[in-house]
């Protein structure tokens, strides 16, 4: 179903009138206006970490965006390499697919044992852990601060902005 949806949306954004005959959607001569300002269309970021998401990204995506997953940088890189291989097999330029991800993060006051599948630790530990994503080629890293109470979450974000981000700038 998602593959059909991505194909339909992409075509609606780029073609004047479309017809579609699929397993889940069937229609004739449909138009969509206004068209997006972005050319050729709004970028499509495909989420998910499994083979179906890899194939979907390779065929339709402008970015692979595994969201909210427990995954090591090495596993993430292997997934992206697979996306690029599949894109090449589909006749697309694999370098045109952006390497992105979303990770959970927690800034602590005391050092904690490190696990490459989790971003948790002091600012110093996080700088080191986050550099691993840069080293494997991630171009966009979204962070989800995993603290349940709002005031604590604000503190996490502020600490990250002041104590971690300055060390990640080129």
Regions inferred by a protein language model and the residue ranges of each:
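Active-site-adjacent structural elements that line small-molecule/cofactor binding pockets in enzymes
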Residues: 1-170
């Amino acid at each position: 179903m998602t593959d059909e949806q991505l194909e339909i949306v992409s075509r609606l954004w780029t073609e004047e009138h479309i017809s579609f005959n699929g397993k889940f959607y069937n229609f004739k001569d449909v138009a969509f206006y206004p068209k997006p300002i972005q050319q050729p269309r709004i970028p499509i970021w495909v989420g998910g970490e499994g083979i179906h998401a890899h194939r979907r990204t390779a065929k339709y995506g402008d970015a692979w965006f595994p969201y909210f997953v427990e995954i090591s940088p090495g596993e993430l890189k292997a997934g992206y390499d697979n996306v690029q291989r599949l894109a090449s097999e589909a006749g697309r330029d694999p370098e045109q697919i952006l390497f992105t991800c979303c990770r959970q993060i927690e800034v602590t006051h005391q050092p904690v044992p490190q696990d490459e599948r989790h971003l948790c630790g002091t600012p110093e530990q996080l700088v080191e852990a986050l550099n691993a994503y840069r080293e494997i080629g991630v171009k966009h890293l979204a962070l989800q601060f995993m603290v349940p109470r709002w005031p604590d979450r604000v503190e996490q974000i502020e600490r990250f902005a002041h104590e971690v981000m300055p060390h990640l700038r080129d």
